Amino acid sequence: MENQGKKGIKVLFSFENRKVAMRVENPKQSIKQTIENIKKEARNDPEKIWYLPEMDAGDNIIRYYLGRKDEKGKDEILKEKNKEGLEQSLYDYGVKEGDHLVIIKKVIAG
């Protein structure tokens, strides 16, 4: 995911009251991979983007998900897999240039 060039789509991501526009190079890659790419970008520049730790202070795993408002204004989590168990992508959810997605943090208690 880079902010240079014209490949892919530019999406506005928000997390903890900070919004950052990022270019998703391949909107057909899995949502899981997209989240991994966001985390990688955040690790490279946490001051400019976000701090997205893998563990909390109590050594509990932190998972991240993507969400948005659906056409009716309700919150929707973009699931990594569909009912058939196939990986989903931003393309599968119809995410397009300029859309706004929210990064959702969930602590998994150990």
Region locations from a protein language model:
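Ubiquitin system architectures
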Residues: 1-110
